[in-house]
Every structure is written in C-alpha cells, then in structure tokens.
C-alpha cells in the first residue's frame, strides 16, 4: 500500500510540476519542459512499461549491510530528488572512476552539487555508447566512483543515491558498500538514456515495484521505474 500510494503521489507531483506554470502570459524559464524515461525495459520506446517489466533495479542499503533499509523501507522523500549527471571518461582506461578531481572540475563548471541529489554517472567513451538494450547486457562492474569521491559526496553534499548504466558488483570493495549503506544511499543500476540528460537542473523520480507484504521487509533489491523531469 505504501509503494502504491507513493506511485500515485509521484504521478500527481509530475502533473503539477509540468503544467502548473503553463498559464497564458506567464514567463517561467525555469519550469520543467519534458520527461525522460530512464527505465531500461525490453522495448525502450514503450510508453506503458510497467515497473515489474523493468530491467532497472534499485540496490537498497540492506543489500550492502543487513538490517539497514530494504527496498520497501526507503523513505519516499529519498525517492524524489535533484539529479546531477557526471561524465565518466573511458577513453584512457576501461576501469576509470570518478575522482575527487573530477568532482571539483564538475563543480567549477556547473556550480556546487545540490544537497540531497542523486548522482548519475554517465559513460562518455564515444566508442562505447550504451543503448537501452545494451546496458542490461553489459558486464558487471564496480561502482564507477572512487571511494574518497563517493564519501565526499555523501558527507559534504549529502547525496542520497547513485545511478549507473551497468550492473554493479560490490564484492571487490566492501568498504565502499559499507559507506553507502551507513549513509542511507541506494544505487540504481542498469539505467538508460543518460545521454538525453543535461548535467544539472533535472529532477529524478524513483518508483520501486510493489513488493508482496510477506517479503516487504526482506527484499533488498527490486525493479524500479525511473523518470527524469528536465528543464
């Protein structure tokens, strides 16, 4: 019931934000202009993709440290947030990670990352652009951000989540996994269409699938539908 209520609420919020400022003679340069569906499904262009058909998944803190939030326990206010996009340059090395220097350079160009943001990490190697269907079949990799950079974002910018285009494996860096869980951060893996997003100014809405009540407190991963409202 909680997840269903949240989905109804986010659709309502979506409608308000998109249409509230569209009044005759009203200048609203900062309003949201369109929505980008970042969900990865079997048919990327499908307009009626259900959450349960989504290949995009949320990894809750409980998947990283047992006893922390499961997917159905993440507070709703942490599922709607400002969205920033940081490019990961893979031209030099396949195992590139976002570094503290990358974060500093991003903020020099775009301004300080808003508190409470979700950080999307976009692959920027021209030779490996991922389509919506490709990202689900890509190799599983570490979260593409250095441990100290992630810790800075969580502690100094109070980020609440990270979104990536590939599957994520935390087995090689349990320290980072622990940091994420202790800060209440979740990860959205196998997302799509990051190339359609600006670096800043968007709003992300994450809607987990409805989980059976008996498993509500145990499921630490779940399919999600994610939308970005773009200015």
Language model regions located:
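Active-/binding-site microenvironments in catalytic and ligand-binding cores
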Residues: 5, 17-231
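Hydrophobic membrane-insertion alpha-helices, especially the h-region
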Residues: 9-17
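N-terminal Sec-pathway targeting helices
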Residues: 1-10
């Amino acid at each position: 019931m909680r997840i269903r209520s949240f989905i109804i609420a986010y659709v309502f919020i979506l409608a308000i934000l998109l249409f509230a400022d569209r009044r005759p003679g009203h200048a609203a340069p900062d309003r949201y202009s369109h929505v980008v569906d970042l969900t990865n499904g079997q048919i990327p262009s499908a307009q009626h993709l259900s959450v349960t058909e989504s290949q995009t998944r949320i990894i809750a803190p409980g998947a990283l440290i047992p006893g922390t939030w499961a997917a159905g326990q993440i507070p709703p206010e942490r599922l709607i947030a400002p969205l920033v996009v940081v490019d990961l340059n893979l031209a030099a090395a396949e195992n590139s990670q976002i570094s503290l220097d990358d974060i500093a350079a991003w903020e020099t160009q775009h301004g300080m990352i808003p508190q409470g943001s979700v950080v999307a990490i976009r692959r920027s190697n021209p030779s490996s652009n991922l389509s919506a269907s490709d990202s689900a079949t890509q190799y599983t990799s570490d979260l593409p951000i250095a441990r100290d950079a992630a810790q800075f974002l969580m502690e100094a910018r109070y980020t609440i989540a990270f979104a990536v285009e590939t599957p994520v494996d935390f087995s090689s860096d349990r320290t980072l996994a622990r940091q994420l869980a202790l800060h209440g951060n979740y990860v959205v893996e196998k997302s799509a269409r990051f190339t359609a997003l600006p670096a800043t100014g968007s709003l992300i809405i994450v809607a987990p699938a409805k989980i059976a009540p008996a498993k509500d407190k145990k499921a630490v991963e779940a399919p999600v539908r994610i939308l970005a409202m773009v200015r």
